[in-house]
C-alpha cells in the first residue's frame, strides 16, 4: 500500500467552525457533496466532531493498512476507513480504539464492521 506521511492540515479555527455548523449545514454549503451513505451510523448518539481526516483503503480480511494509518494519526484527527469491497469484518474494536485514543484521535468513520460496541460507547 501507499502511505502519505506528511498530510495537509486544516487550521484549528476552521475545524471548530465546521464542528459547530454540523453535518447537514456543511453538506448544503458544499453543493450537497460528500455525505456518507445512510448505512453508516454512529455507535454513540449526540456527539459532534470535526478534525483532519486520515484516510485508509483496506482490503477485507486484512487490517495491516489500518494499523499503518493509525501510526499516521495525530491529536484531533479523524480516521476514515473504506474497504475495497463490501465488508462486515470486525476491523475495529476496543484495542484499536485504545490505540487511537492514546494518540488523541477524536473519531473514526468507516464502512466496516465494528466489534466491542458496548465497550466503545
In which residue ranges do the predicted regions lie?
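Feature captures the catalytic cores and cofactor-binding loops of soluble hydro-lyases/lyases
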Residues: 1-121
Amino acid at each position: 500500500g501507499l502511505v502519505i506521511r506528511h498530510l495537509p492540515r486544516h487550521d484549528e479555527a476552521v475545524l471548530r467552525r465546521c464542528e459547530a455548523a454540523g453535518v447537514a449545514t456543511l453538506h448544503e454549503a458544499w453543493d450537497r457533496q460528500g455525505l456518507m451513505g445512510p448505512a453508516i451510523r454512529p455507535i454513540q448518539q449526540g456527539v459532534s466532531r470535526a478534525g483532519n481526516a486520515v484516510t485508509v483503503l483496506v482490503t477485507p480480511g486484512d487490517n495491516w493498512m489500518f494499523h499503518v494509518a493509525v501510526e499516521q494519526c495525530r491529536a484531533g484527527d479523524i480516521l476514515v476507513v473504506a474497504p475495497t469491497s463490501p465488508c462486515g469484518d470486525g476491523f475495529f474494536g476496543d484495542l484499536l480504539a485504545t490505540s487511537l485514543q492514546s494518540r488523541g484521535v477524536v473519531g473514526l468513520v468507516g464502512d466496516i464492521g465494528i466489534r466491542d460496541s458496548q465497550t466503545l460507547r
